A protein has these predicted regions:
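A short LG(V/I)-centered, amphipathic sequence patch enriched
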Residues: 41-58, 254
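Short helix-loop hinge/linker segments at domain boundaries
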Residues: 53-56, 63, 74-97
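Short helix-boundary/capping micro-motifs
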Residues: 12-27
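Flexible hinge/capping segments at coil-to-helix
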Residues: 152-163, 167-192, 207
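Hydrophobic hinge/microswitch elements
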Residues: 212-256, 263, 272
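C-terminal effector-binding regulatory domain of bacterial HTH transcription factors
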Residues: 67, 120, 242-251, 261-303
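Central regulatory/effector-binding core of bacterial HTH transcription factors
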Residues: 91-151, 302
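Residues within the DNA-recognition helix of helix-turn-helix
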Residues: 29, 36, 110
Length: 303
C-alpha cells in the first residue's frame, strides 16, 4: 500500500457502521466501494473485511492495518500541517463531537466562528449523546462533560462546571425545602438516564462529610432539556449542570436546594487521541475553544 489515499479509504470503511454508510461518506456507490476494496485486498494479498449483506466485519489483519494505519495517517497529517504552518496557514478537516444540549448552546457558535477565522478548514460538528466508547474513533475532538471512565483519550480542560440540585418555586411551596440529602428519598425526583450510569444514586459532600441517597424517580428521560423542562414545570427535584440551569436560577424559574451540600463537579473537557503530535488545526481549535470559556465560562459571567 503505497498511496495514503488507500489507507484513508480503508479507515473510512472501518469507522462506518455499514458499507452503505461508508459509500455515502466517500461519495461513491456501494459497488464502487466493494470493487476498490477487492482491488486493495488483491494488492496486499490478504483478506481485510468479511462482507455480508447486512454488515462488515474486519479480519484481524484488517483491524491491525487500521489501528497502525490510523497512527501513521495522524503523523502524516501532522507533518503536512507543520509544513503549512511554516507557510503561515493550515488546511484540512476537523471532526468534532459534542453533547446535544451543550453543543447547541455553547459549541455550535464557537465552531462557526472558528471556521470563519480559518476558512480553509472544513469542520463537521456532530451532536450526540451516545456512550463515549462508540464515538472516539470517529472524531478528532470529543467534547465531554463529567467524569471520564477508563479511557486512553487525553483530556484538555475547557471549563469548570458544577452540578446543582434544583426545583421550581411551586414545588418548594408544596413540599418545602429539604434540610438534608436524605430527605430527597421521600420527594418526587426526576432522573437523567445516560451512558449506562447509576442515575438513582445521588452523592453529596459537605466538607469531610459524605452522604449518598438513593432516589426513586417518578419521571426519567435520556434528554437533558426534557429534564430541565420538567423541573421548571414543578414536576420534581432535578440534578442539572450549572451550564444548563444558571439562567433559570438567576431568573427565579428554579431554586437551588441544599446549597451547603456539594455534588461531584462535571467539568467540561475536550478529548483527543494523543497529547503530542496533534495536527495544527486541532491544536489551534483547542486553544481557541479555551479562550471562549476563560477567564469565566458563559454561565458564570455577570448579566
Amino acid at each position: 500500500m503505497k498511496d495514503p489515499a488507500d489507507l484513508r479509504f480503508l479507515l473510512t470503511i472501518h469507522d462506518s457502521p455499514s458499507l452503505l454508510a461508508a459509500a455515502r461518506k466517500l461519495g461513491l456507490t456501494p459497488s464502487a466501494v466493494t470493487q476498490r476494496l477487492q482491488q486493495l485486498e488483491r494488492h496486499l494479498g490478504v483478506r481485510l473485511v468479511e462482507r455480508s449483506s447486512r454488515q462488515l466485519r474486519f479480519t484481524d489483519e484488517g483491524d491491525m492495518l487500521c489501528a497502525r494505519g490510523a497512527t501513521l495517517i495522524g503523523q502524516f497529517d501532522a507533518l503536512l500541517d507543520d509544513l503549512h504552518q511554516r507557510r503561515g496557514g493550515f488546511v484540512g478537516k476537523l471532526r468534532i463531537n459534542a453533547p446535544f444540549g451543550f453543543g447547541r448552546r455553547h459549541i455550535a457558535g464557537c465552531v462557526a466562528a472558528f471556521q470563519q477565522l480559518h476558512p480553509e478548514v472544513d469542520i463537521a460538528l456532530t451532536l450526540s449523546d451516545q456512550p463515549l466508547v462508540e464515538l472516539t474513533e470517529r472524531f478528532d475532538v470529543v467534547i465531554h462533560i463529567g467524569r471520564l471512565g477508563v479511557s486512553n483519550l487525553i483530556a484538555h480542560a475547557i471549563a469548570p462546571n458544577a452540578r446543582f440540585v434544583c426545583a421550581a418555586p411551586s414545588f418548594v411551596a408544596q413540599h418545602g425545602l429539604p434540610d438534608d440529602p436524605a430527605a430527597l428519598a421521600a420527594l418526587p425526583c426526576i432522573a437523567l438516564r445516560e451512558n449506562n450510569e447509576d442515575v438513582t444514586l445521588w452523592q453529596f459532600n459537605k466538607g469531610r462529610t459524605r452522604q449518598s441517597v438513593r432516589v426513586a424517580p417518578k419521571l426519567s428521560c435520556n434528554d437533558g432539556e426534557v429534564i430541565r423542562g420538567w423541573g421548571v414545570a414543578g414536576r420534581g427535584v432535578i440534578v442539572r449542570s450549572e451550564w444548563d440551569v444558571a439562567r433559570d436560577l438567576a431568573s427565579g424559574a428554579l431554586v437551588r436546594l441544599l446549597p451547603a451540600w456539594k455534588l461531584p463537579d462535571a467539568n467540561v473537557v475536550a478529548l483527543t487521541h494523543q497529547r503530542t503530535g496533534l495536527p495544527l488545526r486541532i491544536r489551534v481549535f483547542l486553544d481557541y475553544l479555551k479562550t471562549q470559556f476563560r477567564p469565566l465560562p458563559p454561565w458564570r459571567r455577570p448579566g
